[in-house]
Amino acid sequence: MARHDDEDQGPQLVHLATLGVTAVPERLDGVALILRMPSGAGGEKATLADWIRLCSKEDCALITASVAVGAEDLPPNGVDGFVSFDMQADRALREDFPDMQIVAADLPSRHVAMQAGNLGADALFFGDLRADTLEGMQAGTDHDLAEWWVEIMEVPCIIPVASAADDPDYAPEFIAVPLP
């Protein structure tokens, strides 16, 4: 995932799915997929392999997110990156996995967001990625913080929205839409 320079294109699409819950579709239209990995999803290896194959076929980055509190794991083999809910704690992973894309999440303040950017996050997710519903994810979005981020910072951000047609006024680089 990278910042694009043509402002007329609008935000790029990031899909959201939950391992073991979301059906694997035939195609993907987005540049990335954030695959939420709930606690106990370890037995879903065949499903994870299906997501890896699909993303590879569709040239779509696969980013995993261990969403259970305190259950962050190393990203599985075959994925392009992972979500960090604590960039301060995960900063060694940036050094250990320099080619992995790291999306920082759980950003309650400007200070924490700036710290995540300074520690090497490739993108920031503004919203509650651990929420079980889109409404919960959106309720956790601090739009003032996200707008400030878009205007001031270079690291791109991701905003959860209901559909690919939604485009927040402050023009984030990426929008995240749950797969049906």
Roles of regions detected by a PLM:
Residues A104-D106, G127, L145, E154-A165:
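Glycine-rich adenosine-cofactor-binding loop
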Residues A65, C157-S163, V177-L179:
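Glycine-rich beta-strand-to-loop/alpha-helix junction loops that act as flexible
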